[in-house]
Design a protein with these regions (language model features):
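Beta-rich carbohydrate-recognition and catalytic domains
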Residues: 1-119, 123-173, 180-228, 241-250
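Glycine-rich, charged/polar anion/phosphate-binding loops
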Residues: 232-233
Length: 250
């Protein structure tokens, strides 16, 4: 999860606090005033017995929509390797993201799926209204699913996006955001592709199009975000001014 808040960039990353192998997935935390000099903090979200903390995002809920008062709200995939199950859960922080409280009603979104992950949340403000939008993936089915919420806890399915021309592979880490192109607002949808021939293994693609608050419509074929190998799992910071978009990937 990446968020810019009160003049600081906060980077939350998947981390095994007990070793260098994949496992015990938790969220580590580092912060920076300039994206160059970083300060490490204690583990932000530790894994539980049957719930590892997979990728997600963070937003500043200044109006207290979620019922936690003004707070940073983190969205993450709760992963159970025992049950092979993935659902979306939330936690909140009142101390600039240093410590977090798990929401007692977790998970907030469950599709009874083993491959439903990587929630990225943004605030949509447009002709359709003013509400929160979540992008997530059904990774093996190669679909981005879009949900809306007024309170960050109860989510309603809006639409799904697929692109058969991408070919084989799994989809991960979607990121939907507006961007001004030649003076006009467009919407960009970024998707990481794993084990995908079209990117030579692992890489990132993006679509440019429109989003009416419900449905994303691509205006053409996908493009490569980076022509090097293994640019993967990148997401952009929330909390930056609308005209700014900064992304960090593996």
């Amino acid at each position: 999860g990446l968020v810019f808040h009160d003049g600081e960039y906060h980077l939350y990353y998947q981390y095994n606090p007990e070793g260098s192998d994949h496992g015990n997935m938790s969220w580590g935390h580092a912060s920076s005033p300039d994206l160059v000099t970083w300060r490490e903090h204690p583990v932000a979200l530790p894994y539980a017995d049957d719930a590892e903390i997979y990728s997600g995002s963070i937003v500043w809920d200044g109006d207290g929509d979620a019922g936690f008062g003004p707070a940073l709200v983190a969205f993450y995939t709760a992963h159970s390797s025992v049950r092979r199950h993935q659902a979306q859960a939330i936690a909140y922080s009142h101390d600039e993201g240093l410590t977090w409280t798990q929401y007692e009603g977790n998970p907030v979104l469950d599709r009874d799926s083993g491959d439903f992950r990587d929630p990225k949340v943004l605030r949509y403000r447009g002709p359709a209204g003013d509400y929160w939008v979540m992008s997530a993936v059904e990774a093996v089915q190669q679909r981005v699913v879009f949900y809306r919420s007024d309170n960050l806890r109860d989510w309603e399915l809006l639409s799904e996006f697929a692109a058969p021309q991408v070919g084989d592979g799994i989809w991960e880490c979607p990121d939907l955001f507006p961007l001004v192109v030649d003076g006009a607002q467009k919407w960009v949808l970024i998707i990481s592709l794993g084990m995908a021939p079209v990117v030579g293994g692992f890489g990132t693609i993006y679509f440019v199009g429109s989003f009416d608050g419900t449905t994303f419509v691509a205006e053409g074929d996908f493009r490569l975000l980076d022509h090097g190998r293994d640019n993967y799992a990148g997401v952009s910071f929330s909390g930056l001014p609308d005209e700014d978009r900064t992304l960090i990937a593996w």
